[in-house]
Amino acid sequence: LGYLSEKKYPESFRLVRYYDEEDAVSWIGSSYNVKISRRSDTGLPLIVDDSGNKYYDNVITLSVVRPDGSEFFNRKFTKSDFSSYIGEEYAKKSALLGIVLEKADGDNLKFAASVGAPDVLSDDYVPLIITISRTGGVSIQKDSRIDSNSDQPDYEDEGV
């Protein structure tokens, strides 16, 4: 379930798939480069799902590079950065799944993040928004536009 390097991992543990992403974004009058890298981290506590499967959690590095090549922002995120939004019990069975650039919004860069079930077949996650200001400040909030854990039935508009 992940890219295995020369380092051998126990067969009973699962790695979440690695990814590296790079995007250009027009922000505050210039073109910035956003780099996002996700890796399993064997140093973080193991996740055990309801079926007893064990997973390594992820660390995601988010970097924003100025047009001149200098680094404006660089931070490693782990699930603990989002703990106040997901609850202690949910955190024990969830992983940091991903961070993606959403948009430049005035003086801020907005990123969608998700913490959820590490099984690739699951759609259980908590959506979050990371905002980075032009001064490098970071804020995190739950994304109220989506509710993946809703108990409400899905309704479709007919004739639309």
Feature locations, PLM:
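A short, polar/proline- and glycine-enriched secondary-structure boundary/capping micro-motif
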Residues: 84-86, 122-123, 149-156
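Short beta-strand segments
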Residues: 71-75, 124-128, 139-141
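Acidic, glycine-rich flexible loop segments
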Residues: 85-127, 132-133
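Beta-propeller blade signature
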Residues: 58-66, 126-136
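A mature extracytoplasmic/lumenal domain signature
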Residues: 38, 66, 78, 113-117, ...
